[in-house]
């Protein structure tokens, strides 16, 4: 089941990246990892760097996807973002923390994508 969930997650991230590109974002990184944590997508548009957590689900039986971005998860994303900005020397940008929810339909290939800008703050 874990491997299946991981492949659903990667598919959701790919769909999210395509959506962001259509919306005029440039993708800076996908699956950025450091000792502080992981960021699914880092994108930029209009001088705003967005650190994006993608949550993909077939069902809301465990709550909606955004609810799984807990305070501790937010902290790890924030710390990873600080590290990324420092390493890349990106100091003169606005930043934002977003969540993209991808809800797949079990009985078809359809999905719903919900882009939650400024989902949490430092």
Curated annotation (Swiss-Prot):
GO MF entry, a single one: nucleic acid binding
Note the InterPro entries from the entry.
Restrct_endonuc-II-like, tRNA_endonuc-like_dom_sf, UPF0102_YraN-like
UniProt family annotation: Belongs to the UPF0102 family.
Xref: HAMAP family: UPF0102
SUPFAM superfamilies (UniProt xref): Restriction endonuclease-like
Q: Name one Pfam family in it.
A: UPF0102
Q: What is this protein called?
A: UPF0102 protein CPF_1959
Q: Note the superkingdom of the native organism.
A: Bacteria
The species this protein belongs to is Clostridium perfringens (strain ATCC 13124 / DSM 756 / JCM 1290 / NCIMB 6125 / NCTC 8237 / Type A)
Instruction: Extract the CDD domains matched here.
Output: PoNe_Nuclease (cd20736)
């Amino acid at each position: 089941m874990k491997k299946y969930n991981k492949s659903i997650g990667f598919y959701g991230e790919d769909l999210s990246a395509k959506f962001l590109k259509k919306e005029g974002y440039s993708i800076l990184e996908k699956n950025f990892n450091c000792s502080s944590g992981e960021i699914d997508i880092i994108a930029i548009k209009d001088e705003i760097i967005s650190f994006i957590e993608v949550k993909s689900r077939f069902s809301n039986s465990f709550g909606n996807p955004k609810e799984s971005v807990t305070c501790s998860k937010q902290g790890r994303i924030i710390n990873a973002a600080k590290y990324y900005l420092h390493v890349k020397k990106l100091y003169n940008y606005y930043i934002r923390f977003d969540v993209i929810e991808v809800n797949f339909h079990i009985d078809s290939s359809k999905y719903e994508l919900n882009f939650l800008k400024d989902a949490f703050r430092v």
